[in-house]
């Protein structure tokens, strides 16, 4: 058995769509994280690893931003990956031309639709916004591109106007419409309501682009899928503007383990992908980050360690090797004899029961003095109790 979750999950009557597309925006929205700037080779390396995972679509960048960005997007588009390569564009002909020049498979055009954005940012009326959006959709489709239209700040947009703009986008040939929860301001219940309302009016695919300002990006994405959405936007490690986006690894594993929806991804590379993005973005993954954090499979408490050594699933919902992660027993204040003995066995060291108890006592004392029990300190402790040993 590789995982063990609550049997009550199966009691709920849930219906996911038959087809779910994940389009990853690590290379675009992820790069918009303050302080992050990826070079072409770094983007290529991440794109290759995403492709190895089996991601369906990669949002490779925003070509009009700079010449270097165009080089990066074009390099990814011509890398021969299995994933569809998308680019972000404003609802402007020049933006779409820049994307076309990069040889991408499709574009995501976006425009803010909330009255707040229309008034204070775009200085447009609703009618003016409608016309601008449709002209760009028509232009992109005339050039044979996959076209997704994203309503920025959709979750704070008047519902009737949102329906109107999505209906018109569908009529103009959009392949998909995106609900952008731009500031993470909707609840899972609100997302459920919104998607169901939109489903009454439009037949085109609906995607969820959720931000994590209130820690609800994953829940909102899943709620949207259950309500009739068919695609989700993600980033590796959940990076992105402000509090970030729906985490790719969390979504994939929640669907697979909690909901038993297997999208066919090569999940064995998830941990490696996480570390690659950490390296290139220079954004350290939090120790307790779900799925890929370093603490997720670390155990210190004596009671926990005893159980995990006997059966890992006592204190792990799934085995770390599923995603290329590793389990680690950490020594500290809460460690017991079993944990220390396991650590000694790693180095092939035998001790008497009395020596073991003394080593445990010294481990606890040192940790309570604020010292981290690394291999060097552990060696010194063992040496002080048992005499010289080979590590």
From Swiss-Prot:
It catalyses: acetyl-CoA + 2-oxoglutarate + H2O = (2R)-homocitrate + CoA + H(+); 2-oxoadipate + acetyl-CoA + H2O = (R)-dihomocitrate + CoA + H(+); 2-oxoheptanedioate + acetyl-CoA + H2O = (R)-trihomocitrate + CoA + H(+). Pathway: Organic acid metabolism; 2-oxosuberate biosynthesis. It comes from the Archaea. PROSITE patterns: AIPM_HOMOCIT_SYNTH_1 (PS00815), AIPM_HOMOCIT_SYNTH_2 (PS00816), PYR_CT (PS50991). It is an enzyme of class 2 (transferase). Keywords: Transferase. GO terms for biological process: biosynthetic process; carboxylic acid metabolic process. Coiled coil: none annotated. Residues 20-271 form the Pyruvate carboxyltransferase domain. One of its GO terms (molecular function) is homocitrate synthase activity. Pfam families: HCS_D2, HMGL-like. The keyword Transferase applies. Its EC number is 2.3.3.14, 2.3.3.-. PANTHER family: (R)-CITRAMALATE SYNTHASE CIMA, HOMOCITRATE SYNTHASE. Belongs to the alpha-IPM synthase/homocitrate synthase family. Catalyzes the condensation of alpha-ketoglutarate and acetyl-CoA to form (R)-homocitrate. Can also catalyze the condensation of alpha-ketoadipate with acetyl-CoA to form (R)-homo(2)citrate, and the condensation of alpha-ketopimelate with acetyl-CoA to form (R)-homo(3)citrate. These reactions are part of the biosynthesis pathway of coenzyme B and biotin. This is Homocitrate synthase AksA. It comes from Methanothermobacter thermautotrophicus (strain ATCC 29096 / DSM 1053 / JCM 10044 / NBRC 100330 / Delta H) (Methanobacterium thermoautotrophicum). The gene is aksA.
